[in-house]
Structures are given as C-alpha cells and as structure tokens.
Amino acid sequence: MKQSRFERAICFAVNAHAGMTRKGSRTPYIVHPMEAAVIASSLTEDEDVLCAAVLHDTVEDTPVTAGELREEFGERVASLVLFDSENKREGLPPADTWELRKQETLDALSSAGREEQILVLSDKLSNLRSIFRSFLEKGDALWLAFHQKDKNKQEWYYRGIAEKLTLLRD
C-alpha cells in the first residue's frame, strides 16, 4: 500500500529526530512535532500544512536542509517549514540572540497568512503544553533548561504570539 505524503512526512521526521529528546526531559523529541500536527489537524485538512507541522523543526534542529524538504515534499511544505524556523545565527550563543530571534518571529507573524499562523500556533501551543507539564513537575527550575531563563521574557514572547494570530480569532 502506498503511503500518503503525510505518512511519509511522519517517517521523515521520526528519522530526522531519532535519538533526540525534549529540552530538560526524557520525552522523545518526535512527540512535539506529532502533537503540533494533531493541533494543526483540528484547524485544517490541508495536507501541506499537516506535513509542515510534523516537519517544522527538521531544518532548525537537525541536519535536514530546506532543499531536501523541497525535493521530498514540495515548495509549499518547505516554505511553511522555513517560515516557522528561526535563524539561529551560527557561531553566536543562543542566549545572546534569543530576543532578536523571537522578535523576528513576531514581526513575520504580522503579515503571515492563515496557514503560517496555524503552523506557528500548533508549534507554540505544543511548546506551552510541554512547559506547563514541566512546571508541574519542576516549578520555576524548569527555566534552567532554556536559553532564556527569565520567565517574564518567555511570557512576553508567548503573549506576543497570541496577539499576532489575528486570522485565527474567529
């Protein structure tokens, strides 16, 4: 039986994230992109968006390139993944570029389409759920696993995301 593109995207993401765990956790990393895809599926049936949701961290956090995604899943999926990928500024400490990277995400959301907003919402809601679970277990010590350890700055970022998701308010 032939796999759908979404099923191929799941397998691709599983392989790309093999052996990785979530920040400050033993949870297999693939749980996050899978949860993001489930969240996205509650807002759209667009297969490109669902593929992008499960693949959204492959370029940012693994050796996978945008070209590989483009070749395997098409231009639209690759573009969506790149929209939700940060420029990590190789060679600079992540803690030093955290605020700049987050501001770039907020700025990009100002002119984003519905599909991009669904993708970002799915990613960030999954992150917030993970943060909440960690908070219940570790309290404020959970922030020690993050590049940005100031919970007020984290709040600034996630509130900013919520404010920018204007196309999803209805």
Where are these regions (language model features)?
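Active-site helical microenvironments for divalent-metal-assisted chemistry
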Residues: 1-170
